[in-house]
Amino acid sequence: MAGNKPFNKQQAEPRERDPQVAGLKVPPHSIEAEQSVLGGLMLDNERWDDVAERVVADDFYTRPHRHIFTEMARLQESGSPIDLITLAESLERQGQLDSVGGFAYLAELSKNTPSAANISAYADIVRERAVVREMISVANEIAEAGFDPQGRTSEDLLDLAESRVFKIAESRANKDEGPKNIADVLDATVARIEQLFQQPHDGVTGVNTGYDDLNKKTAGLQPSDLIIVAARPSMGKTTFAMNLVENAAMLQDKPVLIFSLEMPSEQIMMRSLASLSRVDQTKIRTGQLDDEDWARISGTMGILLEKRNIYIDDSSGLTPTEVRSRARRIAREHGGIGLIMIDYLQLMRVPALSDNRTLEIAEISRSLKALAKELNVPVVALSQLNRSLEQRADKRPVNSDLRESGSIEQDADLIMFIYRDEVYHENSDLKGIAEIIIGKQRNGPIGTVRLTFNGQWSRFDNYAGPQYDDE
């Protein structure tokens, strides 16, 4: 009979394809993988956790499969078994049994899945296809926005594109994340301790700050930490942050990245030349240099050009997604980053949250912490302080003085305030001395470190004066 003839693919295809039909593309999916996941769960309820940490209902391509998985989740949460009978009855109660194909389709799912042995691999396939479909959806959304910008600039559209794509990555937890057995954590911890034991580091396990007393307090700037440097105007917060960058660049080979939202790159470079050459920055700004000054600057330039590991981005009004994409590019090109510095946090923007400053700052702070973790690099972000501290007798900052402080204080691993008494008291006994007040340190002590401030060189140096109370 004709029905028994083998299927011929060429015979099934029309000789001339309809151009409109040919232009239609079916989103990536795997019906077989979805069926195997659902069937496997009916065979072995114990595999639910393996599947649930990989996929959610929306990852399934067909609506019936989404409904079935949702109902399975409801049964699991109520402590009921998931099998052909309980699932069919539950779907019946929700009025969805017929829409998913009836009892017959559920029976087919169960019958056609021989075992749940490979269910994790099938779930990974479902998840992978779902991510690609999300990317296609976002790409279409970006294209629509390009055709109909509604008054948005190209920069706004780029920010939209980056944020939508990054949101896919952020919403998809890595399958390597999640709870780990203490044995695995201990193995990794002991391996790290052994590594530190075998490598001489003088107590500095992170990025060397260049300041002995600060290193003793912090053990260096730790990878994945968000570090906030805050001060009132004229205290030298940009100078201090730049000195951290310079010291990191000189003491290691990894690139350091500066996002200067307030100051152009030429001014940043002039400060660095003054600091590293120990030449009066006023002379550099005015060009009134003698032969000795030129010799010092030439020597510094030679070192900087030899290392070539400082990158400066002086774009204004950057968004977290722009900072993230540019930092990622540098990290990708150089196999990592040693340090990221942002001057300063409140000059960043999140267009979608511009109507609510508190939420905007919270998103910026959260994003910078996420960047530090993603690239495993210390991120130093400068921050403003509230004017209210000017009304106090003791004007040394505390954590609550951070402007829009709630989210910043919560996200930060290390908070350092700069205080110079001579700014407020002309006849202070502490002229030329800066206090670095550690207001918060998630994994270390708080306290105060003294540094010598050489303003003419735009530089903080190690303190060599009498002993002081560092509590």
UniProtKB/Swiss-Prot annotation:
GO terms for cellular component: cytosol; DNA helicase complex; DnaB-DnaC complex; DnaB-DnaC-DnaT-PriA-PriB complex; DnaB-DnaC-DnaT-PriA-PriC complex; DnaB-DnaC-Rep-PriC complex; DnaB-DnaG complex; primosome complex. Hexameric enzyme depends on Mg(2+); in its absence, DnaB is trimeric. It is an enzyme of class 5 (isomerase). 5'-3' DNA helicase activity is stimulated 2-fold by single-stranded binding protein (SSB) and 6-fold by SSB and DnaG primase. One of its GO terms (biological process) is replication fork processing. Its cofactor is Mg(2+). The main replicative DNA helicase, it participates in initiation and elongation during chromosome replication. Travels ahead of the DNA replisome, separating dsDNA into templates for DNA synthesis. A processive ATP-dependent 5'-3' DNA helicase that acts on preformed replication forks (have single-stranded (ss)DNA tails). ATP is the best nucleotide for helicase activity; GTP, CTP, dCTP and dATP are poor substitutes. Participates with DNA primase DnaG in primer RNA (pRNA) synthesis during initiation of DNA replication. Has DNA-dependent ATPase activity. Deletion or mutations in this gene were selected in directed evolution experiments for resistance to intense ionizing radiation (3000 Gy). Homohexamer ring. The helix loader is a DnaB(6):DnaC(6) complex with a cracked opening large enough to allow ssDNA into the central cavity. Component of the replication restart primosome, which is composed of PriA, PriB, PriC, DnaB and DnaT; DnaC is required to load the helicase on the replication fork DNA while DnaG primase associates transiently with this complex. Interacts with PriC alone and in the DnaB-DnaC complex, probably 1:1 binding with PriC. (Microbial infection) Forms a DnaB(6):lambda P(5) complex in the presence of ssDNA. Lambda P helicase loader reconfigures the DnaB hexameric ring, generating an opening large enough to permit ssDNA into the central channel. This is Replicative DNA helicase DnaB. It comes from Escherichia coli (strain K12).
